[in-house]
């Protein structure tokens, strides 16, 4: 049984360029790619924190955004679950769809 997420279908139907910014570090890159593949989540770019970088997700994701996304793309929306990261994205003026309870 193939399970697809409606949001993923909408992104594909509208030919959106999908950039994943993960809080996982590079040591998990292969496992993360496999998980994305197994869950039928297409993407165009995958950005992850450097191995052994244990800084707060807000800092890491903001740095990735500034370095790789901000001046290159017109971001339509962000999907995230962690409350404090959702707040960071919103503080940048981005529309955020919070995908789960994120008080962790």
Which sequence ranges carry the predicted segments?
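Short phosphate-binding/catalytic loops that engage adenosine nucleotides
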Residues: 16, 41, 94
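Short His-Asn-centered micro-motif
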Residues: 21-24, 79-81
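Substrate-recognition "cap/lid" segment bordering the active-site pocket of phosphatases
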Residues: 26-74
């Amino acid at each position: 049984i193939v399970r697809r997420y409606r949001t993923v279908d909408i992104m594909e139907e509208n030919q959106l360029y999908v950039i994943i910014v993960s809080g996982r570090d590079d040591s998990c890159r292969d496992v993360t790619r496999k998980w994305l593949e197994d869950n039928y989540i297409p993407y165009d770019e995958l950005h992850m924190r450097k191995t052994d970088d244990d800084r707060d997700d807000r800092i890491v994701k903001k740095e990735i955004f500034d370095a790789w996304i901000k001046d290159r793309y017109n971001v339509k929306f962000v999907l995230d679950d962690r409350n404090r990261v959702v707040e960071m994205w919103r503080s940048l003026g981005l529309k955020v769809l919070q995908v789960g309870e994120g008080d962790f």
